[in-house]
Design a protein with these regions (language model features):
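AAA+ P-loop NTPase catalytic core and its hallmark functional loops
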Residues: 1-238
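Alpha-helical lid/collar subdomain of P-loop NTPases
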Residues: 1-33, 43, 50, 217-222, ...
Length: 324
């Protein structure tokens, strides 16, 4: 259980904790609770996105993080919350999440041997009552009925009316609201993100801050993959990691030029490095199982050629092997 009266009292040194050259005053909670995310000591913070998230926590701004999949949008919010000891819950707004899931519903309970109908609160009323941050993942994939529930909470006072209960919930002073999205509310123009919707512009206006999180620089990404896979911390291992990240960069460039429809995220590179160890350091086999088999069949030859260029090894999918 969270203490509804808990307040953030500990001033955070942004230079020391996040490496930010900023005088913004941000306070966190003194104690960690079970709802506070675990700290990932290897996490690399994007300065602009971190500032937006910190402003959200410090000044109760509504913050949306937009970017391609695998850039670490949700994790970014969680890792900031972890260092502020701020309780945080993530809700994935897939097409199965309904208004009832968010608001709550009547449920039958046994009380003194009798069946009694009581209102079972959903995640949103619970979050509003507590000093917690709620993160709506895949915000642009939410159903229309769900989006209109969230729209009311996005307003300045953020009160939520439970019509069934004749109750108006006033948010806890330490309640915070964040969202992540692959698109920025204008629908998917790339064809990559099936199921995403255009977001009502009246609703987009209610987000105080919108930050774009792009892929990391080559060196920063290689450092993260290495931190997640310390067994590669040898001269040969570091070279392999660098080649893996370079291949990921090639897929992203090809994607932006319209030559590929599948892109390698940092998450995929980390998985590739881990899988290569599982398969007795067979980097090519691990690459095929981790990424290549996810690609469109017509694009696999192009991706296999990227691999051959970097690792000097022909894969079964490459043009040279097929021609032979």
């Amino acid at each position: 259980m969270l203490d509804v009266n808990a307040k953030p009292t500990e001033e955070i040194d942004l230079r020391e904790v996040f490496g930010l050259d900023s005088d913004m005053k941000v306070k966190g909670f003194a104690e960690r609770t079970s709802r506070v995310p675990e700290i990932d000591p290897t996490y690399k913070f994007d300065p602009d996105t971190t500032m937006a998230i910190l402003a959200g926590f410090a000044y109760n701004r509504r913050v949306m993080i937009q970017g391609y999949h695998g850039t670490g949008k949700s994790t970014h919010i969680e890792q900031v919350a972890a260092r502020l000891n701020w309780p945080c819950v993530r809700v994935n707004l897939d097409s199965h999440v309904s208004r009832i899931d968010l608001i709550g519903k009547d449920a039958i309970k046994l009380v003194d041997g009798k069946q009694v109908t009581t209102f079972h609160e959903g995640i949103l009323p619970w979050a509003l009552r507590n000093p917690t941050a709620i993160v709506f993942d895949e915000y642009d994939a939410g159903r229309a009925d769900v989006m209109f529930v969230i729209q009311r909470v996005l307003e300045a006072d953020g009160k939520l009316t439970l019509l069934d209960q004749n109750e108006v919930i006033t948010p806890n002073p330490s309640f915070r609201l964040f969202a992540t999205a692959n698109t920025v509310g204008l629908g998917d123009t790339t064809g990559l993100y099936h199921g995403t919707q255009q977001i009502n512009q009246g609703q987009m206006d209610r987000w105080s801050l919108v930050s774009t999180l792009n892929y990391l620089s080559h060196d920063a990404e290689a450092a993260i993959v290495l931190a997640k896979n310390p067994t590669y911390n040898t001269e040969k291992g570091r070279k392999i990691i660098n080649q893996m990240v370079t291949l990921a960069d090639l897929t992203r460039t090809a994607f932006m030029q319209g030559d590929l429809s599948t892109v390698m995220s940092p998450r995929t590179v980390i998985a590739w490095a881990q899988n290569a160890r599982i398969f007795a350091d067979n980097v090519g086999y691990a690459f095929r199982l981790t990424f290549l088999n996810k690609c469109d069949e017509l694009e696999r030859q192009t991706v296999a050629e990227f691999y051959q260029r970097l690792f000097d090894e022909e894969l079964p999918e490459s043009a040279a092997v097929k021609a032979g």
